[in-house]
């Protein structure tokens, strides 16, 4: 972390105890300027919340059998959505509520949605559409307001389809 005011770097390393980063392999970052919070997605360490003002960490991990936790401790991307975070993981996507630390796993009930497992990237366009890059499954678009999920895949018979189903970001 770089403190612009003091012009100093602060290094965070995994240490025993709850007040450190959970893993040093970082895959995703999102800075919430309104709350001065850095959300850190790690590879095998789940999601970390760093409160810049206090320097305190909070960890969010997958708990087997608990659908209100992360679908995986391998976090690939983080995107803000209203007062929540869309978390892309190695085992699907969830809508994370920072207020209570709970996840709502998305797309578990639809045939198309069950294809969304190894998610490489998520982003929103200017119309509020969520775009999902799912390794091996192409690209998905999702509208929260309508619940419409669309899968775009490579089709050798269609020269206008995407070029490959392995989309990383």
Language model regions located:
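Carboxylate-rich, polar loop motifs that coordinate divalent cations or form catalytic acidic clusters
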Residues: 1-169
